């Protein structure tokens, strides 16, 4: 019975490359001369540092542009609160979303059931497994989800026959 998984996870290699490119651009830009602006990457978390709120926004813009060039969807990023650290400097923690959330997975299962396509959808942790008897039905489900789900970047993997 053919099946596939609906997941929501960023390519961490591309995220790392985008952070390195952003840091390289920040270190060479004239408007960041003499400032301690940078982006740090630790597992599923990015931390943006800058001298003030304006420069922090500039750092985030550089990061977003580099991620877009590396084909990393910016909907993976979840921005935390801006915190003041020593003196006037500020930092912001940006978490990288991983996995399909509970509400989104329920919405996906409901959409699949309401579509009347002859497939079964089940929630398995942070993924949604879709299985059916025909490969064409599964491809129709993928097309429907790509069209209708816009709040999260979905990937489809583990396609089995």
From Swiss-Prot:
- Report one GO cellular component: cytosol
Annotated InterPro entries: DUF520, UPF0234-like_C, UPF0234_N, YajQ-like_sf
What superkingdom does the record give? Bacteria
| GO MF annotation list | nucleotide binding
**Keyword annotations of the record:** Nucleotide-binding
Which Pfam families does this UniProt record tie to the protein?
DUF520
**NCBIfam families in the record:** PRK05412.1
- Family label: Belongs to the YajQ family.
Q: What does this protein do?
A: Nucleotide-binding protein.
What is the protein's name according to its record? Answer: Nucleotide-binding protein RALTA_A2535
Q: Which organism is it from?
A: Cupriavidus taiwanensis (strain DSM 17343 / BCRC 17206 / CCUG 44338 / CIP 107171 / LMG 19424 / R1)
Question: Lineage of the native species?
Answer: Bacteria, Pseudomonadati, Pseudomonadota, Betaproteobacteria, Burkholderiales
